[in-house]
């Protein structure tokens, strides 16, 4: 069994095991007890960190990615290996934060430390000028509202979110007429 299957690596102790004697497994790097699977038998995959049934994919076999919840084709990257981040829409270098992993929030300009909040991950909020703590509120996350002078609780009214309208003496909706700003 050993001589007919394992060929040049028959002298290795692990190659004498019956579960390793398959044509697809007979490689120097693959004749190991826990690594003899067709999908696992590649040099870059036969590592101690990759010996899991759920982790034998070529794209998954890196030390920081070999975990059951990380072995997906679109999620096998070091920065993506978090339980809350292993999704197709979240596996990006700048977007793998637990609070950032929603489809509408996974954009480079939105995934910042000050912007990755559950209350701020909305399409209307994900612009570079809107990603700061004072702007990420339900009543303030609008592109036209999210500029530094406008980002305040008082100024972000539904009818009054024009930069030219929000001044210290005119923070109320009744002041925001076109002739009043």
Curated annotation (Swiss-Prot):
Keyword Nucleotidyltransferase: no
The entry's keywords: Keratin, Repeat
Sequence repeats: 5-9, 20-24, 25-29, 30-34, 35-39, 40-44, 45-49, 55-59, 60-64, 65-69, 70-74, 75-79, 80-84, 85-89, 90-94, 95-99, 100-104, 105-109, 110-114, 115-119, 120-124, 125-129, 130-134, 135-139, 140-144, 145-149
Tissue expression per record: Expressed in the hair follicles.
UniProt-annotated stretches for the region 26 X 5 AA repeats of C-C-[GRQVCHIEK]-[SPTR]-[VSTQYC]: 5-154
InterPro entries: KAP
Domain of life, per lineage: Eukaryota
One Pfam family per UniProt: Keratin_B2_2
Listed GO biological process terms: hair cycle
One CC-aspect GO term: keratin filament
Keyword Repeat annotated: yes
Protein family: Belongs to the KRTAP type 4 family.
Subunit architecture: Interacts with hair keratins.
Function: In the hair cortex, hair keratin intermediate filaments are embedded in an interfilamentous matrix, consisting of hair keratin-associated proteins (KRTAP), which are essential for the formation of a rigid and resistant hair shaft through their extensive disulfide bond cross-linking with abundant cysteine residues of hair keratins. The matrix proteins include the high-sulfur and high-glycine-tyrosine keratins.
Full protein name: Keratin-associated protein 4-5
Organism for this UniProt entry: Homo sapiens
């Amino acid at each position: 069994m050993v001589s007919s299957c394992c060929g040049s690596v028959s002298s290795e102790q692990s190659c004498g095991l019956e579960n390793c004697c398959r044509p697809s497994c007979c490689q120097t790097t693959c004749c190991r007890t826990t690594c003899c699977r067709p999908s696992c038998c590649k040099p870059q995959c036969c590592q101690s960190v990759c010996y899991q049934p759920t982790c034998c994919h070529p794209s998954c076999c890196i030390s920081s990615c070999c975990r059951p919840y990380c072995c997906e084709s679109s999620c096998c990257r070091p920065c993506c290996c978090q339980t809350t981040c292993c999704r197709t829409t979240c596996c990006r270098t700048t977007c793998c934060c637990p609070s950032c992993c929603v489809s509408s929030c996974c954009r480079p300009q939105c995934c910042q430390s000050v912007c990755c909040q559950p209350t701020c991950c909305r399409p209307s909020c994900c612009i570079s000028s809107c990603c700061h703590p004072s702007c990420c509120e339900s009543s303030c996350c609008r592109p036209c509202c999210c500029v530094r002078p406008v980002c305040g609780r008082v100024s972000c009214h539904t009818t009054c979110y024009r930069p030219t309208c929000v001044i210290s003496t005119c923070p109320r909706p009744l002041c925001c007429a076109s002739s009043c700003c």
